[in-house]
């Protein structure tokens, strides 16, 4: 459902703007698609909302990739 909403935005609303307006690469909508597919709906949506909060004239923009997925077990094994 979230993916369809983002794709709908990209197909129907985004072209109505005069030229590219996102100051980031990947664009905020592509970032949201990647974040949701990589991290799941909840964490991906939180990451996408954080990106949207940074997307404004006060931020220089630039390359801002979706962070990699971290393993559930960061210490690599069973505790002894």
Curated annotation (Swiss-Prot):
Any one GO cellular component localisation term in the record: plasma membrane
Entry coiled-coil feature ranges: none
Membrane topology per record: Peripheral membrane protein
InterPro entries per the UniProt record, alphabetical: Membr_insert_effic_factor_YidD (IPR002696)
Compartments where located: Cell membrane
Keywords: Cell membrane, Membrane
Any Pfam family the entry gives: YidD
Highest taxon listed in the record's lineage: Bacteria
Family the entry assigns: Belongs to the UPF0161 family.
NCBIfam families in alphabetical order: membrane protein insertion efficiency factor YidD
Summary of the function given for this chain in its UniProt record: Could be involved in insertion of integral membrane proteins into the membrane.
UniProt protein name: Putative membrane protein insertion efficiency factor
């Amino acid at each position: 459902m979230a993916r369809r909403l983002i794709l709908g935005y990209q197909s129907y609303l985004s072209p109505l703007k005069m030229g590219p307006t996102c100051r980031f690469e990947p664009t905020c909508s592509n970032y949201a698609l990647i974040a949701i597919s990589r991290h799941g709906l909840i964490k991906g949506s939180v990451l996408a909302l954080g990106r949207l909060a940074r997307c404004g004239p006060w931020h220089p923009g630039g390359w801002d990739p979706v962070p990699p997925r971290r393993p559930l077990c960061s210490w690599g094994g069973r505790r002894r």
